[in-house]
Amino acid sequence: IQAKLSFVLGIDYANDNIHNRIDGACARYLNMRKKMNTMPYALFVHGDSSENIKDNTGIYTERGKSVINSVFGIGEQNEEKLGKGVFRQYGKGVDGFNICSCQFAIHYFFESKNKVHQFLKNVTETTKVGGYFIGTSYDGLTLFNELRNKKQGESLYIYKNDNKIWEIVKQYSHEEFKS
């Protein structure tokens, strides 16, 4: 918001992270937009950034594919078919975005060489030449130390009311952290 972005395209693997009516990205965005007229326009789609985004392989719904195509200037530029919000962003990503980011999810792509390679390909295909990629990840040493007294299979977690909102499961038996 303070960076004065004009548009945000969000892609999340977990559909609930986008569409949950209470605290999904869409609900939070709409609530913030009511309060702040400086909020950038935003579109959110359900997908997997370890699969190709621009060719829609990584996009899970037909509506999401239509959104991605429109943002990258592919297909018919028709407000009636696309809807006002999507139509407004038609072609915004044709040359890539000034900023692409991955917040606290980059570790998922290291499941395999193929996934990390495709993720990096997405970054290069969707970031404008001269643009920036911003990634955040957890501090491995801090998490290792937090999990030190946990047995394999036990976890750290945070609840909000009665809903688990965060959990990390210890899936290793190493006793020393090797960076």
Question: What are the language-model segments listed below?
Answer:
Residues 1-7:
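Conserved SAM-binding loop of SAM-dependent methyltransferases across substrates and taxa
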Residues 7-15, 46:
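Conserved SAM-binding motif I beta-strand of class I
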Residues 14, 24, 139:
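Residues in the short beta-alpha loop(s) of Rossmann-like NAD(P)-binding domains
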Residues 136, 140-179:
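SAM-dependent methyltransferase
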Residues 17, 52-54, 108-110, 141-145:
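Short catalytic/ligand-binding loop motif for oxyanion handling, primarily in non-cytosolic enzymes
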Residues 90-96, 107, 113-132:
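A short glycine-rich, Lys/Arg-flanked "PGG" loop and its adjoining helix->strand segment in the class I
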